[in-house]
């Protein structure tokens, strides 16, 4: 029988609940230090209250609910591409694999990412073990560039070859 102190085994992707929104696909990334969540319409009120919505209007997860908080910080984040951005950090309630707790998320535009939520190692440290052979969730987005390229290849292999391969050889 598992005790509250036992580490729970999770997969590389999991469904989570954040701020009352259920069945959110999340990527568990032990290579990322902190956790991030897709936030939109981020504004600062005159009194210093940070206001934002979770997810974007085109997301099926978007509820339109505005979250207001005065408990936030700013952090400089270096992306996996090497870009540096300043982002707000907020505490939000998280349910992961049956465990409820509050954790810090950076607010980011994750509209182009495969998962709207990234759970970093600080969030799972000491509480969870990641089994990379397990994945509860498939990505909600597919790389559109690859899809378009393969469709072009399928539609007309000769034009594709001339456009992307042969045309590049002479340059």
Predicted segments — roles?
Residues 1-171:
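Pepsin/retropepsin-fold aspartyl endopeptidases
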